[in-house]
Each structure stands twice: as structure tokens, then as C-alpha cells.
Amino acid sequence: MGNVCFRPSRSHVSQEFSQSEFSTASPVRTSERPSDASLDAGLESSSACHRSGLRGPAKHSMLSLDEIGLVGAARWPDDAPGLNISNKSNTQENKRYCESLYQAARIAGGSIASGRVTSFDGLWRNATKWRLSRILSGDASKIDFATVRMPNTRFVTSLRRPYHSVIERVRNHSDANSEIYEGEYLGGIETKVYRQHGTISSTTIPMTIVSAVADDDDIHERLKSLPKNERRHLKDLMAASHPNMITHTDAVYLPMIKDHLESLYLQAIDPSLEQHEALELIARIHWWAASAAPDRRGSAAKAEFAARSIAFAHGIELPPFEHGAVPDIEAMLRSEEQFVEDYPNLFERPPQ
């Protein structure tokens, strides 16, 4: 096994670890609630947009200020004020983050429509630039948000809070199979496993693996069997070897996936597309980018940034995702076709 890299919690941070160590939230920059002027900033003129044939963003936002404050928020199923530590979408800090994503994606949509962003790689660079702008320069982990994952590194997300709601979903997933876990400390425990695959030019590639112990009592009994003085130490060590885990797409497949995203992008910026056709391609791009998780940090936010930017280029506004729908998690728990079918219904209301 190569190095183990833990995906971040939704406090806008992550870090690479060799053991079960997790970082705290890094500070983000503040900004004022957007005015009409700031929402229009950076948009291309209507004549520039016309040169590409794409409409570009509407002159004025079709979302309310409350909706803008939820664009890009990770709205976990248990995310409600005062409910538990997963709650972040209602904080002022998170609203500023969401407003920033909305404005930056709107500007990027104008750049797509004007012909200045001609590739998915260029759009991803825009997304990365925006994401880096939300991190203070003194944060030592900032470089991870601009670093592509390397092959032979096992990249995982532990299903601890705020990801714990995924456990029940994989247990009940219609395409999850029962397997016997082979980890170092919890080997032999029955586990439910969903294995995601993608297809590019008739080639099927393995992607995200989401797993969860079938019965919590099996974990508790195993821990109870350990000497008391070893339990806490082993609990920490088990974070990298635990059945409750998302194991992300092997980085060896990233070049192939990136080429596929370039092809999808060129299809998605065709000005002749009807709205439903554009949304289908946007959903495919969102699925591949989120499920691939190409960067060490920030891939989920960048995937949503890309989807919203392409929508803006077509004059389409995507509302916030509905409460309980965290888009990258929704992507990782679905096949491409299922995600495309469900995509319009994952928003609070229909895109317009």
C-alpha cells in the first residue's frame, strides 16, 4: 500500500496523514454580501457573449440573497442550527464562502461565453484560483488545494462526522454487496461495499469505493476484546484501516478522466444545446470531476464551481442543492447515468 491521504472534513481544510490525525478549520477571508454591482462585476458585454453564441450570465441574479448564501454549502442531512457539529451552512462564515463561489462562478461563466475559457483545464484553473483565494496565505496546507493527486497513494475519507450519514446509505444501497473486511485491526467483519465504475470509450474503470460495517455491534465487540490500555491508541491507528471509509478513484486513472472531461466540456459549451441537453452534460461533468477527486484538496468545491460556471455560460442559474444533498457524495453513491437522471431533482427548485 502507498501513502494514505485523508480527505478533509467540510471545514474548508484537509491534510495528508500517515495516521488518524485530522486538522481544524482554517480561516477564510471575509467579504460583504453581494450587491448588484458586485454580481455584475467581471461579466462580458452582451456583444462579447454573442461572439461565442452562448448567452452568458443573466444581467441580474435569478437567485435570492438567501439562496446565494447556500450555493456551495455542504448541507448534510443533520445540518440544522444547534443540532450537532455538522452544522455549518447557516454560519456567517459559510455564507460568505458561498457568496464568493457564486460570484466567481458567474464571472467564469461570462469568460466561457466570451470564448476566453476554451478548455476544462482552463475552467479548473479558474476554480483553483478561486478556492485558493479563500485561504489565508499563512496556511501551510494551501498548496494542497493546487496539487494533483499522485498514483500509488491511497486517498480516503473516513466516515466520521460530518460524513457519518453516508454509513446508513451504503448499508441500504441497492448496488452494495456484502464483503468480509480484510483490514489490519478489524479483519473478518462483514461490510457493505458499493463499488463505482465509469466508462470511457467502451473502457470500464474502477472509481470510488464506499464501504461501511454491516453491524455496529461487530465493531464494538471487537474493540471490547482489546486490552483497555490499548483501545484508545488502536482507535486512532484504525482510522486508516477501517470499514467505514470512502476510498477515492486511483490517481492512475486521472489522465484518462481529464481527457474525457475535456471532451465533455467541448460538448457542453455548444451554443445550440437546449437547456435540458446542457444540464445533462453539466451533470456528467459534475459526476466525473467529483468522483475523480483529482486534487489533494478542494475537488468537491471545484467540481461544483465548474458545473455552475458552464450553466452560467448558457444563461442558466443553478439554485442551491437541497438540504441533505451534498453533490460530491451524491455523485460517489451513484452511477453516471443515475446521477444524470437525478441531477435536476437534487436542487432546491428547478434550474432556470
From Swiss-Prot:
Q: Mind telling me what this protein is named?
A: Avirulence protein C
Keywords of the record: Virulence
**Which organism is this protein's natural source?**
Pseudomonas savastanoi pv. glycinea
Spell out the residue ranges making up region: Disordered. Answer: 15-57
Q: Which NCBIfam families match?
A: XopAH
* Pfam families named in the record: AvrB_AvrC
Q: Provide the disulphide bond pattern.
A: none
* Assigned protein family: To avirulence B protein of the same strain.
Instruction: State if Aminoacyl-tRNA synthetase is listed as a keyword.
Output: no
Q: Where is the composition biased (Polar residues)?
A: 15-29
